[in-house]
């Protein structure tokens, strides 16, 4: 696949990420979003799509990076798995919550 085969927004993300090769050069979400003139949510969505297409873009608490070693890749995967587990717990709680949970709370007006 060639860079030109990607949508323009994705091309811009990939090009920007070339400056962040290695976990020690990770870039914060808000900084990258500002550089690319995207909302943080839009950028997250595009990075998730790129990851799904086989682009190795890792994320840790310090931001996004291109892994250069298996250890860096593993750290990014662990972060993603923890995020997935957290989302799964939230979905489970939301799914099981009573629709009148707010009315059931004592002391709320």
Predicted regions and their residues:
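Short alpha-helical segments that sit at the start of domains
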Residues: 1-16
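Short amphipathic alpha-helical segments that mediate assembly, nucleic-acid/protein binding
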Residues: 10, 71-74, 98
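Short helix-capping/hinge SLiMs at alpha-helix to coil transitions
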Residues: 18-24, 53-55
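A short acidic, leucine-rich amphipathic alpha-helix
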Residues: 28-35
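Short amphipathic alpha-helical interaction segments
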Residues: 38-49
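A short, conserved structural fragment
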Residues: 51-61
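Minor-groove-contacting beta-hairpin "wing" of winged helix-turn-helix DNA-binding domains
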Residues: 60-69
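Long, low-complexity, charge-rich intrinsically disordered regions
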Residues: 76-109
């Amino acid at each position: 696949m060639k860079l030109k085969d990607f949508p323009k927004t994705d091309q811009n993300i990939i090009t920007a990420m070339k400056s962040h090769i290695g976990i020690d050069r990770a870039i914060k979400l808000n900084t990258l979003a500002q550089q690319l003139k995207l909302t943080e949510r839009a950028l997250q969505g595009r990075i998730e799509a790129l990851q799904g297409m086989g682009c190795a873009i890792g994320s840790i608490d310090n931001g996004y990076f291109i892994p250069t070693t298996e250890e860096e890749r593993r750290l990014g995967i662990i972060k993603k798995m923890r995020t997935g587990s957290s989302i799964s717990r939230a979905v489970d709680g939301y799914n099981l919550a009573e629709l009148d949970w707010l009315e059931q709370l004592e002391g709320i007006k």
